[in-house]
């Protein structure tokens, strides 16, 4: 994954490569799981037990799920990135959340799995802490895609081999929101530029939303509908007829970073990073609440 990140930094890989290569890179991980565990049976949530029973063997679908999880984790941090301290900061919060969860579960039935996770997470946390010190605003070290892919795959490995992949996904709540919000651009339903970073205004010293500009007629009916619905719910800002002939439309790039700027207005980079990391902390608090309270509605704990 480090090599993939380096290749992306140097070669600017297309999105289809970013999906294909992590899938291939996850094969050794899936082989380790198959050789050492091989368990593909899940506990069915309470609302579905009358139809599916208490347990259900997913077979190969479980490996498909784990492969998709590895691809998501690898790219999740990479698409919520681009301002000083955000990549290392969100990785720190997620790692701290996983460590806390592992410590809580040490007295449970899966002690060895959580000790295994701690062997990875504790060194990762402290090395990332040192990186964050130099990566925070004003940054003296830049992480690039190399760190993002490495961090994401590290989380995927401990989540899969530590048998807490569902809980680990809960620690990715901001990344899931960012992914869902970004889907129209990631699937090119709405034109997606190579970089979707916020725009720096040298006059104010603040970051502003960046925009995607495209011909209005080039947008598909589905893209037009998504844009209209998103605009109605104030999720995007749309400027129509931005040229003298009225042929072009602009909309803000669909990232969580731009959405926060849309809500709060132009923001200093240090403040913006702090707000996004605060969202990550709030997401982890929600994750623990779901894991230890709301879970009772779906499972016997």
Please state what every model-predicted region is:
Residues 1-189, 195-202, 287:
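"…together with the soluble PPM/PP2C metallo-phosphatase catalytic core" -> "…together
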Residues 161-301:
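C-terminal membrane-associated helical module and adjoining short loops/tails
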């Amino acid at each position: 994954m480090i090599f993939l990140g380096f290749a992306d930094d140097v070669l600017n890989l297309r999105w289809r490569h970013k999906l294909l290569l992590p899938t291939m890179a996850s094969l050794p991980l899936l082989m380790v799981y198959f050789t050492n565990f091989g368990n593909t049976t899940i506990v069915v949530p309470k609302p579905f037990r009358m139809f599916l029973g208490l347990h259900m063997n997913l077979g190969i679908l479980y490996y498909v799920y784990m492969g998709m999880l590895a691809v998501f984790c690898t790219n999740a941090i990479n698409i919520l990135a681009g301002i000083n301290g955000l990549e290392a900061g969100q990785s720190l919060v997620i790692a701290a959340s996983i460590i806390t969860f592992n410590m809580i579960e040490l007295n449970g039935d899966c002690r060895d799995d959580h000790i295994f996770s701690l062997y990875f997470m504790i060194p990762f946390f402290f090395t990332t802490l040192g990186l964050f010190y130099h990566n925070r605003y004003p940054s003296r070290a830049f992480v690039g895609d190399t760190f993002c892919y490495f961090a994401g795959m590290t989380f995927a490995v401990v989540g899969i081999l530590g048998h807490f992949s569902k809980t680990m996904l809960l620690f990715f709540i901001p990344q899931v929101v960012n992914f869902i919000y970004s889907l129209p651009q990631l699937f090119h339903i709405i034109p997606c530029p190579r970089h979707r970073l916020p725009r720096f205004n040298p006059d104010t010293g603040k970051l502003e939303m960046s925009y995607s500009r495209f011909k209005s007629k080039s947008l598909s009916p589905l893209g037009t509908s998504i844009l209209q619905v998103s605009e109605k719910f104030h999720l995007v800002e749309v400027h129509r007829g931005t040229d003298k002939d009225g042929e072009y439309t602009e909309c803000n790039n669909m990232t969580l970073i731009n959405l926060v700027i849309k809500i709060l207005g132009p923001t200093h980079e240090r403040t913006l990073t702090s707000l996004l990391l605060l969202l990550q902390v709030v997401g982890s608090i929600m994750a623990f609440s779901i894991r230890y309270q709301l879970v009772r509605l779906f499972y016997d704990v």
